[in-house]
Amino acid sequence: MKRVYSKIESIAGNVITVTAQGIKYGELAIVKAKDTSSLAEVIKLDREKVSLQVYGGTRGVSTSDEIKFLGHSMQVSFSDNLLGRIFDGSGNPRDGGPSLDDNLIEIGGPSANPTKRIVPRNMIRTGLPMIDVFNTLVESQKLPIFSVSGEPYNELLIRIALQAEVDLIILGGMGLKHDDYLTFKDSLEKGGALSRAIFFVHTANDSVVESLTVPDISLSVAEKFALKGKKVLVLLTDMTNFADAMKEISITMEQVPSNRGYPGDLYSQLAYRYEKAIDFEGAGSITILAVTTMPGDDVTHPVPDNTGYITEGQYYLKGGRIEPFGSLSRLKQMVNSRTRDDHRTIMDSMIKLYASSKESVEKKAMGFNMTKWDEKLLKYSNMFESKMMDLSVNIPLEEALDLGWSILASCFSPKETGIKTDLIEKYWPKKETY
C-alpha cells in the first residue's frame, strides 16, 4: 500500500488536505518541506480526503511537498530515563539531552475501566493550609485552579510540585511564556524536585497546534507510572490555551461553531482528559491539578463553565491567594474525618468566622461605628489572611490545625467560637488571651 504522497490538495491554517487510501484516524505522518520536516496527525477522514494538522505549522509548506504516513498514532518513550527530563509537546527533547526511542507507547488511549478504580481515600499533603485544612486534595482527584491572567497560578503549581507528598510530578505546559518555563525548571532544580519530575512543555513561541498533544502525552506517561505503583501528580497549565488551540483547528476545518466559537465537543474533549485521574487497585494513582484561566474573570466562559461540570470541585485563585469562598474540594469529606478529630471543626469554624468578618470590614470601610465584636472579627481576619491564606506559608497539616486554634484563641473566647466543649478542652491553647 502506498504510504508516500507528493501532492497536497489544500493548505488552510495549520491543516493540510491530501488524497490518500488506507489511512487511519489519528495516524501520524511526516511532512517534508524544502528545508525542514514536521510531524502531522490525521484529524479528519472524508473517504479518500485526508486532513492533517501539522504540528510545526504550515509556514514554508507547498502543495508539492512530500507526505509520508507512518502507520501508527503518536508515540512516546516510557522508562525511568524520562525522570528529570524536559520534552516538547511531541516528546522531543527540549533540554539538549539525548532522544529516547526505546519502549514506545501510544498516547491518547481510552480511560481506565471503571471496575479498576477504587474509591478515593488518601490525602495528598501539600504544606499549604488553604488546601490541606480547608479544601483537602485527595489522591485520584481532578481539580481545576480557576484564575485570571496576572495571578501567580504558575507559582502556586511550583509550590505544590516542591511540597506535595507524591512519588512523581508531571508538568504539562501549554502556551507557557519562556520566562515561566525557565522559572518552573530553575525552581524545581533548586528545590531538588527535578529528579522526580518530567516536563512536557509547549511554549508561546511554538506552533499553536502542538499544545493539543501536551495533556495526552502527559497523562499517558502518568498512567504507565501509576500502573507501576507510583503516586503521580499531573500539573497542567493552561487548559484555556489548550481549548483555544482546539478552537483554532475547528475554525480552520470550517466546523459549525458552538458557544463563543469553541467546537461543539469542547465538553467531551475536556472530560476525556480529566477522566484519566484514577486510583488503581493494587497499584498507583493519577491526580490532576489544571490551571484554567478565565478571560475577563468570567466563570461562565465556555472553558471554565464546562470544566466545572467535569471536575470534583475547584480552587479559585484571587488576589494571590486561594479564595475560601467558591473554592471547593468535593472529595475532602472522604479523608478529613481520618486526619485528626478536630480537622472538620477547625475548617468549619474558621471559615464561618472569616465570612462574618467580611461584614465588619465593610462596616469599617463605610465609616460605621465598630463594636467590640467587630474589632475581634477584624483582628481575626487579618491573622487568618496573613497566617493561613498566604501562599508562602508551608507547614504540615497538624501544625496548621494547631495554628488555627492559636488564631482563634488570640481573638475570641471559647464560647464565642461555637466549638464543642470536648474539643475546646482538648485543643484550646492555655496561654492565649483574647
UniProtKB/Swiss-Prot annotation:
Family classification: Belongs to the ATPase alpha/beta chains family.
Protein name, per record: V-type ATP synthase beta chain
CDD domains in the cross-refs: ATP-synt_V_A-type_beta_N (cd18118), V_A-ATPase_B (cd01135)
Domain of life of the organism encoding this protein: Bacteria
Aminoacyl-tRNA synthetase in keyword set: no
PANTHER family: V-TYPE PROTON ATPASE SUBUNIT B (PTHR43389:SF4)
Biological process according to GO: proton motive force-driven plasma membrane ATP synthesis
InterPro entries named in the record: ATP-synt_VA_C (IPR055190), ATPase_F1/V1/A1_a/bsu_N (IPR004100), ATPase_F1/V1/A1_a/bsu_nucl-bd (IPR000194), P-loop_NTPase (IPR027417), V-ATPase_su_B/beta (IPR022879)
Record-level Gene Ontology MF annotations: ATP binding; proton-transporting ATP synthase activity, rotational mechanism
Functional description taken from the UniProt entry: Produces ATP from ADP in the presence of a proton gradient across the membrane. The V-type beta chain is a regulatory subunit.
Keywords, alphabetical: ATP synthesis, Hydrogen ion transport, Ion transport, Transport
Lineage: Bacteria, Pseudomonadati, Spirochaetota, Spirochaetia, Spirochaetales
Coiled-coil region list: none
